[in-house]
Curated annotation (Swiss-Prot):
It comes from the Eukaryota. It comes from Candida albicans (strain SC5314 / ATCC MYA-2876). Its cofactor is Mg(2+). The active site is at 307 (proton acceptor). It catalyses: L-seryl-[protein] + ATP = O-phospho-L-seryl-[protein] + ADP + H(+); L-threonyl-[protein] + ATP = O-phospho-L-threonyl-[protein] + ADP + H(+); [DNA-directed RNA polymerase] + ATP = phospho-[DNA-directed RNA polymerase] + ADP + H(+). Residues 49-59 have a biased composition (Basic residues). The gene is SSN3. Its main location: nucleus. This is Serine/threonine-protein kinase SSN3. Residues 17-47, 528-583 have a biased composition (Low complexity).
Length: 608
């Protein structure tokens, strides 16, 4: 099948490629003029059909021939170009990528968990001028962002919540001074190949060193890291921890966040000292309002946090709440699989909603509001309200989740025994049978008595605070307050007003986070990487030296071969000159056979 040039151009315009044919074209001096004229046309057409060839890819030539080129089928040529160009791109990307230690100065680690470690760091001085102004903390703007949030929630309602934005702390939008770098543990395991050292080989704690009898197998990026990276890149809210950067270095993932000097767990522990009084009412109100504001933002974007607790609620030195640790967070709009299928156990046990304890397969954002209610109660009493003991999962049967009897017991002792009168779908939960078997006694609701007796009966919070707490701790998730409803609760309308700075009015400062420098494995890993790089550089230098020596030897061998060729050429020239001289004097083999030699001047001499 053949195409004319006009029809071929029409096919190009509609995106139809030329039929793939494998042909061999030979170019020589005797080639007809018509074929040589067609080559520019074919080349111009191929430029429109295919990607521009990589100049580093050599032309495909047959060995031992000159001017002969074999063509590749067009789809294969396109595939090879698109694949081979990834190599230079990755190489250029690696050259421009900067390491963690070249950008940040590590001051020590501040927290550790199953996910890995969190380090406090600051930007190096040589990077300050190269960083954009919008890459750091969002900061607190001079405008009343809280009132704007309330206007979005409270469109036509005449009663609006007034937010007190006055503060004595100087706040700006400049680049943050410190960062929190979260290093995830690699999903890997060590496989022993051979062990003949009587158990002498073992991994040293806190690093990734591998001994001679072990091989490190990487199984990929953890699900927690993928969730947190994908969600934090898209979120931008005043009360959500801001992600600054993501660094991939030597199969380790580093997430760089804005740094907060405090968290609620630290504040609660500090206030629980016998010499200190309870947390002031304005501080509690401001903290809870900001938490609800961040949760509202998450839920409006179809995100469940699923791990709200005081340790995951950060507070900046300017009194701004930042919800962090989205490792268990998940989007709940049109999920491909049920929330229970992905994670059978969510939320720390003390803050876990009763529907989760009863084994629900389908839950709603109400699980986050129950956790907020537990946090509010802990801020009021300076201790967890439902401090139960978690039943551990059987290692031999990880698919089954145990019934959390003790945790339910702690909840029932304060909120009373739930019934179908106050919880319509109670008898539809998978663990309802276990619930009826273990809880036969009817407990009354003692939340109001608990509220009056906290802090030795010295509770300065109003009844509106108790109403908010009761609305957040409803058994039935359908009757529980939503984040929007909680933000509009009358508790936030009464005095004292919600402060933009939760620490406004305090005559003391909370201590900063403690920094640990005794186990700084990020530096150890970097040192090992530098040593490996130095070793690689030394090996490369040795290889280069060997190559140079080989090149010198090859060049010397080539010189000797050239000299031998020149000597042979000289001998051949001498023989040619001598034979020409003999022919000029009439010498022939007959005279030589007869024993007569030619002498100069035509004189002959008889031998012997």
């Amino acid at each position: 099948m053949s195409y004319s040039s006009a029809s071929f151009r029409k096919l190009n315009n509609v995106g139809i490629s030329q039929p793939s044919q494998t042909t061999t074209t030979t170019t020589s001096a005797n080639q007809p003029q018509s074929q040589s004229q067609q080559q520019p046309l074919q080349q111009s057409q191929q430029q429109h059909l295919h990607m521009k060839p990589n100049p580093h890819i050599p032309h495909h030539q047959l060995p031992g021939t000159v001017g002969t080129r074999t063509s590749i089928p067009q789809p294969a040529l396109m595939a090879s170009n698109s694949i081979l160009t990834l190599g230079p791109f990755k190489h250029r990307k690696d050259l421009t990528r900067e390491s963690v230690l070249s950008t940040y100065q590590i001051m020590g680690y501040i927290a550790a968990g199953t996910y890995g470690k969190v380090y406090k760091a600051k930007l190096k001085s040589n990077k300050l001028n190269k960083t954009d102004d919008d890459s750091g903390i969002d900061g607190i703007n001079n405008k009343d962002i809280f009132s704007e949030s309330m206007n979005d929630l409270h469109h036509d309602n005449s009663s609006s919540i007034m937010i007190n934005t006055t503060t004595n702390i100087t706040i700006n939008n400049s680049l943050p001074q410190f960062f929190a770098i979260k290093k995830f543990k690699s999903d890997n395991h060590h496989h022993h190949i051979n062990n003949n050292n009587n158990g002498g080989n073992h991994l040293s704690k806190g690093n990734n060193s591998i001994h001679q009898d072990e091989v490190l197998h990487y199984t990929g990026i953890s699900q927690s890291a993928i969730r947190e990276m994908s969600l934090c890149r898209e979120l931008n809210n005043k009360n959500i921890t801001k992600l600054v950067d993501i660094i991939l270095e030597n199969k380790s993932i580093y997430m760089v966040f804005e740094f907060c000097e405090h968290d609620l767990l630290q504040i609660i522990h500090y206030q629980s000292h016998p010499d200190f009084k309870p947390i002031p009412c304005p501080t509690i109100k401001s903290l809870i309002w900001q938490i609800l504001n961040g949760v509202t933002f998450l839920h409006k974007n179809w995100i469940l946090h699923r791990d709200l607790k005081p340790a995951n609620i950060m507070v900046s030195s300017q009194g701004v709440v930042k919800i962090g640790d989205l490792g268990l967070a998940r989007k709940f709009k049109s999920p491909l699989q049920s929330l229970y299928t992905g994670d059978k156990v969510v939320v720390t046990i003390w803050y876990r909603a009763p529907e989760l304890l009863l084994g629900t397969r389908h839950y709603t954002p109400a699980v986050d509001l129950w956790a907020v209610g537990c946090i509010l109660a802990e801020l009021l009493s300076l201790r967890p309200i439902f401090k139960g003991e978690e039943a551990k999962i059987d290692l031999n049967n990880k698919k089954s989740v145990p019934f959390q009897k003790n945790q339910l017991q702690k909840i029932i002792e304060i909120l009373g025994t739930p019934t179908t009168d106050i919880w319509n779908n109670l008898n539809k939960y998978p663990e309802y049978l276990s619930f009826t078997q273990h809880f036969n006694q009817n407990y009354p609701n003692n939340l109001s008595n608990w509220f009056k007796l906290i802090n030795g009966g010295n509770n300065q919070n109003s009844e509106k605070c108790l109403e908010l707490l009761s609305g957040l701790l409803k058994y039935d998730p359908e009757l529980r307050l939503t984040a929007d409803q909680a933000l509009l609760h009358p508790y936030f309308l009464e005095l004292p007003k919600v402060n933009e700075n939760a620490f406004e009015g305090l005559n003391y400062k909370y201590p900063n986070r403690k920094i640990y420098t005794d186990d700084n494995d990020i530096m150890t890993t970097a040192a090992n990487n530098n040593n490996n790089n130095n070793n690689n550089n030394n090996n490369n230098n040795n290889n280069n030296n060997n190559n140079n020596n080989n090149n010198n030897n090859n060049s010397g061998h080539q010189l000797s071969q050239q000299q031998n060729v020149q000597i042979q050429q000289v001998h051949q020239m001498q023989q040619q000159i001598h034979s020409q001289q003999l022919q000029s004097h009439g010498a022939n083999s007959t005279y030589k056979r007869s024993g007569i030699d030619d002498l100069p001047g035509g004189i002959r001499k008889k031998r012997g």
